[in-house]
């Protein structure tokens, strides 16, 4: 039976992939509240930049794996790469539970980066494979909603478990269960290779040079040669640079101002919860109003939210700031990936997505590195304030350089 393209036509597969990414995100959520505090309290790391080294290792490993994941998936199939990612993920909670030194935590986060780079990349690409062109924003939005719902749920749960028991090992027992479920779901889901072939056939043009590009050509196009792809990549990097800072510094900032671990965990959870929730609507909205407006105003909303968090001084307003930060991130996250799908040919779309995700997730590492250095020199507040400048500038850059990539709106 021939395959058909469309979310409705592949609803069972689509739902399976959404649920799978819920568990992918949960792997990161376990760490968001616990690890920054673990570095200070159990391993006695006095330097902020040293304490954030686990994010740097995670960011760079995920970024590098993202780059190669697209190419590997184009050659060997999405499902195999998805399964490989989950197998690698099994070692993350085990190493964290038994770690006797901080370098073991850092190494575990290298493996977490590999896990996330392989699994999350594949759930995105597989959804785009089975979706129509005018459903890409919806597909990516639902994917990211599920993933960041997992992040939020586990950030809150791990914070609760850590405050009720201890920072280790109890929160990481959850991670072992998550990996087992992820492997089972990945065995059930079907590969989307046949759907991809249909898209390549339907997209075939006389200009073969556009459709068939080398890895180097795709990297150059996505990084700097194509003004749309490069603008998208810069906005992605700025978004996750801010997130790398938030991941590392928010727990330290909020506990410093007097909040409990449980309260801090709530704020740390609300941000990705809002991020995930609003993507239910922003992905669909980008399919209707276009990509450029959401990207530009989303970057500015992120910058404003960070400055707002520093300006206010109450738990309820910090919650509001976290919601605004999640909203701004949700405006750009599915939209940027949908825009890649608009511009790139199906033949090299996964590779281009890999390059974009390479630069985007390098932001985790750069954000933690820059924020850690500034925090050590000037303090945590200054680090948050300065990092907020980058998403603001990325919004200006998108406003000036990015075309509308959704063809129905661009016309």
Residues of each region from the PLM?
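Juxtamembrane intracellular "pre-TM" segments in multi-pass secondary transporters
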Residues: 1-11, 194-232
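Helix-loop boundary and gating motifs at the non-cytosolic
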Residues: 9-59, 228-231, 235, 239-257
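Residue-level signature of mid-helix packing/kink "hotspots" within the transmembrane helices
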Residues: 58-67, 151-152, 272-280, 364-365
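Helix-to-loop junctions at the C-terminal end of transmembrane segments
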Residues: 65-77, 162, 279-290, 375-376
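Helix-breaking motifs and short loop linkers at transmembrane-helix boundaries and internal kinks
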Residues: 77, 98-103, 290, 311-313
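Structural signature of the two symmetry-related core transmembrane helices
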Residues: 80-94, 293-308
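Cytoplasmic helix-loop-helix junction between adjacent transmembrane helices
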Residues: 110-149, 338-339
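Symmetry-related core transmembrane helices of the 12-TM Major Facilitator Superfamily/SLC fold
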Residues: 170-187, 384-399
């Amino acid at each position: 039976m021939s395959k058909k393209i469309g979310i409705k036509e592949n609803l069972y597969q689509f739902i399976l992939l959404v649920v799978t990414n819920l568990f992918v995100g949960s792997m990161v959520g376990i760490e968001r509240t616990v690890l920054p505090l673990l570095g200070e309290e159990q391993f006695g790391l006095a330097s902020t930049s040293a304490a954030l080294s686990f994010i740097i290792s995670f960011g760079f490993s995920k970024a590098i794996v993202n780059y190669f994941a697209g190419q590997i998936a184009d050659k060997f199939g999405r499902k195999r790469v998805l399964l490989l990612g989950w197998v690698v993920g099994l070692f993350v909670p085990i190493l964290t539970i038994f770690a006797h030194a901080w370098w073991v935590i850092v190494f575990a986060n290298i493996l977490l980066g590999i896990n996330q780079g392989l699994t999350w990349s594949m759930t995105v690409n597989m959804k785009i494979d089975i979706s129509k062109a005018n459903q890409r924003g919806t597909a990516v939005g639902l994917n990211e909603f599920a993933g960041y719902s997992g992040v939020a749920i586990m950030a809150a749960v791990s914070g609760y478990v850590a405050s009720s028991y201890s920072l280790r090992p109890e929160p990481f027992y959850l991670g072992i269960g998550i990996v087992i479920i992820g492997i089972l779901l990945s065995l059930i889901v079907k590969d989307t290779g046949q759907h991809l072939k249909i898209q390549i056939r339907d997209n075939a043009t006389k200009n073969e040079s556009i459709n068939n590009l080398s890895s180097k050509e795709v990297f150059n196009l996505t990084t700097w040669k194509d003004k749309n792809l490069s603008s998208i990549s810069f906005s992605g990097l700025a978004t996750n640079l801010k997130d790398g800072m938030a991941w590392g510094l928010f727990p330290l900032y909020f506990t410093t101002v007097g909040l409990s671990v449980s309260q801090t965990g709530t704020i740390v959870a609300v941000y990705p919860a809002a991020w995930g929730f609003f993507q239910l609507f922003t992905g669909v909205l980008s399919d209707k109003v276009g990509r450029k407006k959401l990207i530009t105003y989303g970057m500015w909303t992120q910058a404003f939210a960070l400055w707002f968090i520093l300006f206010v001084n109450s738990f309820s307003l910090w919650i509001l700031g976290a919601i605004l930060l999640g909203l701004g991130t949700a405006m750009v996250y599915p939209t940027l990936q949908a825009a890649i799908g608009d511009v790139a040919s199906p033949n090299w779309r996964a590779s281009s997505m890999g390059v974009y995700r390479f630069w985007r997730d390098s932001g985790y590492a750069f954000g933690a590195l820059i924020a850690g250095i500034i925090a050590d020199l000037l303090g945590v507040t200054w680090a948050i304030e300065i990092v907020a400048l980058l998403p603001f500038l990325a919004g200006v850059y998108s406003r000036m350089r990015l075309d509308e990539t959704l063809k129905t709106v661009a016309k």
